[in-house]
């Protein structure tokens, strides 16, 4: 299917058709819509190689994730990746997943960047002090950080206010009378983990609550289960528990249910960041910190990346969303 056939049908020039499909601003919106509609009707697909030679772009984005903390068992992460990929596909852009050791001196994604096989990077699970961000900025490589950039560099980033998430949840529990609130926190140095931990600590300190019950655990059901079983064996177990991720939260809920402490007269209040996974066997409406829908997040991230590869200033792309607290049925006054 050629541009000439589309041009003949619409009664316009081949040049106009080409520029309309290329997204040039000198083509009227109404004309572009007619051209795009006719192209879709005919099943027209542009010559990708020719377009890449013309624009100098590869139409590919790399998403870098930590190889030592593989997030593929996280439904939250995989849902986000799926949505980003789907949204970028609307622009005929492919998403490549790149495993990388964030602490290494030589990063795997640099080979793709230097060989011009990708147009930009998305850096997932940023560190609180991330040398990759500094390196990419100095090298002039377009990227979007999923997490705020504490170095203060003029970089593009998208983040949730993770501090506010756990702070809100802890404040709600304190308002109900809880004084012993445990946190199951991921045993990593990712920026979002540290922010969630600090939000919990700050809320406790604001009310003069000391000796916090902090357990550093891997983000797995098993780790959450074992940590809660240990906490509930203490002489003075916590009256409330917050988990900073969904998988350890599911394990925590299973442990409490097994102990008969998820509901009833001796129930322990439970809040799970991101809510329980979709495949959880827990039937209660567990309290959660909600970070918007996966589709909205994917759309936001893909839109920011699209702006980056089309020349938008990184400083203009620094966005933070605030999560909300959902009380569910597992938050209540202390029962013991």
UniProtKB/Swiss-Prot annotation:
SMART domains named in the record: HTH_LACI (SM00354)
Record SUPFAM superfamilies: lambda repressor-like DNA-binding domains, Periplasmic binding protein-like I
Boundaries of every HTH lacI-type domain copy: 2-55
Keyword Signal attributed: no
Subunit structure: Homodimer.
Role description: Repressor that negatively controls the expression of the raffinose (raf) operon by binding to the raf operator (rafO) DNA. Acts by binding to two operator sites, O1 and 02, which flank the -35 raf promoter box. RafR bound to 02 alone results in 45 % repression of transcription, whereas RafR bound to O1 leads to only 6% repression.
DNA-binding region: 3-22
Organismal lineage: Bacteria, Pseudomonadati, Pseudomonadota, Gammaproteobacteria, Enterobacterales
Keywords: DNA-binding, Plasmid, Repressor, Transcription, Transcription regulation
Pfam families, alphabetized: LacI, Peripla_BP_1
Effect after changing residue 50 to E: Loss of activity
CDD domains to which the protein is assigned, alphabetical: HTH_LacI, PBP1_AglR-like
Top-level division of the source organism's lineage: Bacteria
Gene Ontology molecular function terms on file: DNA-binding transcription factor activity; transcription cis-regulatory region binding
Signal peptide range: none
Protein name: HTH-type transcriptional regulator RafR
């Amino acid at each position: 299917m050629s541009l000439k056939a589309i041009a003949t049908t619409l009664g316009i020039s081949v040049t106009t058709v080409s520029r309309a499909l290329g997204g040039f601003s000198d083509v009227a919106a109404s004309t572009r819509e007619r051209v795009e509609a006719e192209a879709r009707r005919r099943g027209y697909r542009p010559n990708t190689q020719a377009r890449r030679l013309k624009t100098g772009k590869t139409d590919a984005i790399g998403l870098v994730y930590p190889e030592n903390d593989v997030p593929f068992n996280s439904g939250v992460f995989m849902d986000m990746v799926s949505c980003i990929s789907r949204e970028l596909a609307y622009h005929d852009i492919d998403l490549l997943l790149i495993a990388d050791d964030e602490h290494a001196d030589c990063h795997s994604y640099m080979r793709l960047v230097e060989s011009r096989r990708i147009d930009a990077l998305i850096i997932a699970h940023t560190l609180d002090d991330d040398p990759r961000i500094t390196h990419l900025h100095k090298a002039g490589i377009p990227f979007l950080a999923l997490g705020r950039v504490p170095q203060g560099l003029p970089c593009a980033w998208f983040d949730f206010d993770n501090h506010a998430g756990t702070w809100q949840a802890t404040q709600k529990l304190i308002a109900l009378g809880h004084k012993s609130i445990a946190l199951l926190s991921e045993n990593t140095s990712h920026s979002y983990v540290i922010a969630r931990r600090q939000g919990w600590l700050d809320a406790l300190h604001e009310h003069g609550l000391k000796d916090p019950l902090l357990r550093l655990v891997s983000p797995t059901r098993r780790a959450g289960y074992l940590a809660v079983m240990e906490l509930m064996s203490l002489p003075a177990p916590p009256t409330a528990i917050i988990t900073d991720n969904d998988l350890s939260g599911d394990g925590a809920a299973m442990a409490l249910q097994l102990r008969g402490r998820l509901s009833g007269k001796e129930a322990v209040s439970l809040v799970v960041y991101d809510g329980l996974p979709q495949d959880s066997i827990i039937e209660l409406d567990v309290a959660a910190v909600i970070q918007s829908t996966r589709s909205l997040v994917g759309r936001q991230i893909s839109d920011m990346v699209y702006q980056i590869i089309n020349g938008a200033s990184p400083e203009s792309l620094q966005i933070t969303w605030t999560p909300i607290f959902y009380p569910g049925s597992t938050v209540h006054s202390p029962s013991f």
